[in-house]
């Protein structure tokens, strides 16, 4: 097992199933929308697998981490490239003023409410990554309906993608 995990691309790469190439070529690698889509796709596939295998609790943290990260990247994609950090409230606070007058008020409220839900359960972007990062004061039990979270996140990320496209 001494073979490296990250290798030069093989000549027969198109024939290998599941192969991935990371091609930075001196650039960032993937655009923010591509990263957002990759994490959304990963979350959706995990949701589908969890539902199909009835492995709900085992898949919960990876699913929510992927969705939370897709949300963060979606917010960043709609903001100037100089905006950094992992704080959803800060990212939302930077984006929201520019939406007023361009996006229906009820949609702005809906976006803010969904973002606030993630902030409530994962204020430091760590709750779904580490076993010991549960924020104090969090509800002891919360229910996540996988069908609902998949549909809601698809809508949320679509709206943010449209906002990002309109910003350009």
Task: Outline where the language-model segments fall.
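Domain-scale activation on soluble regions of proteins
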Residues: 1-168
């Amino acid at each position: 097992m001494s073979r490296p995990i990250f290798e030069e691309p093989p000549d027969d790469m198109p024939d290998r199933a599941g192969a991935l190439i990371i091609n930075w070529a001196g650039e960032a690698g993937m655009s923010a929308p591509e990263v957002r889509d990759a994490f959304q796709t990963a979350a959706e596939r995990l949701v589908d697998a969890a539902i199909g295998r009835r492995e709900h609790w085992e898949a919960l943290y990876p699913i929510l981490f992927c969705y939370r990260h897709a949300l963060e990247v979606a917010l960043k994609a709609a903001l100037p490239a100089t905006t950094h950090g992992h704080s959803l409230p800060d990212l939302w606070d930077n984006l929201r003023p520019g939406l007023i007058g361009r996006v229906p008020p009820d949609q702005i409220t809906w976006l803010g409410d969904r973002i606030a839900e993630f902030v409530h359960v994962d204020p430091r972007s760590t709750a779904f990554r580490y076993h010991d990062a549960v924020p104090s004061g969090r509800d002891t039990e919360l229910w996540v309906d996988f069908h609902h979270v998949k549909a809601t996140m698809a809508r949320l990320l679509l709206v943010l993608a449209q906002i990002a496209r309109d910003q350009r």
